[in-house]
């Protein structure tokens, strides 16, 4: 799970934060846990920050630590709650690409809860649009863009998706 806030332990180093689920839920030896945590940090390009503490790294780096921690146990499913919350557009794109690459690389099913249309366009294969707790629409990006559904909520979502796709991922 990748939380909206990175949800890191301030008193633990970056390496220790990634090791935390391994310490709690794996039967690995201490050396194996370190090796796995370092591998995950390397995968998100943060191996050089392993001895730093969360307060010493940027918000984008904290999100990448959260991603490394989320994949440490090699899950089949990855749940992301607003993974780009509080990040600038450039860093958001990096996080989107990282989630997409890791999901593809490890063949994980990923569920992303987001309001970020760039994320929807960039990494969404299948989209479920929920409005006021009700499923309004489900399908691929192209199905949504070419949909003839006409409720106000469906039109609003469709127009936002079309506008964002024309604007591009700047």
Predicted features along the sequence, with ranges:
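Conserved ABC ATPase signature
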Residues: 53-57, 61
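Helix N-cap at the start of a conserved alpha-helix in ABC-type nucleotide-binding domains
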Residues: 89-91
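Short helical segment in ABC ATPase nucleotide-binding domains corresponding to the A-loop/adjacent helical element
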Residues: 15-23, 34
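H-loop/switch region of ABC-family ATPase nucleotide-binding domains
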Residues: 114-115
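A short, proline-enriched helix->beta-strand linker immediately N-terminal to the Walker B motif
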Residues: 72-76
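Catalytic Walker B motif of ABC-type/P-loop ATPase nucleotide-binding domains
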Residues: 78-81
């Amino acid at each position: 799970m990748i939380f909206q806030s990175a949800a890191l332990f301030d008193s633990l180093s970056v390496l220790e934060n990634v090791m935390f689920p391994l310490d709690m839920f794996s039967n690995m030896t201490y050396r194996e846990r370190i090796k796995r945590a370092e591998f995950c940090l390397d995968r998100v390009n943060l191996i050089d920050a392993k001895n730093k503490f969360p307060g010493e790294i940027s918000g984008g780096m904290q999100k990448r630590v959260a991603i490394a921690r989320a994949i440490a146990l090699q899950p089949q499913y990855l749940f992301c709650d607003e993974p780009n919350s509080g990040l600038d557009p450039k860093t958001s794109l990096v996080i989107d690409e990282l989630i997409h690459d890791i999901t593809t690389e490890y063949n994980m099913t990923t569920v992303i809860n987001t309001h970020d249309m760039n994320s929807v366009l960039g990494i969404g294969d299948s989209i479920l649009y929920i409005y006021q707790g009700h499923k309004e629409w489900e399908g691929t990006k192209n199905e949504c863009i070419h949909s003839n559904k006409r409720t106000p909520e469906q039109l609003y979502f469709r127009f936002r998706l079309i506008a964002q796709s024309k604007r591009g991922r700047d």
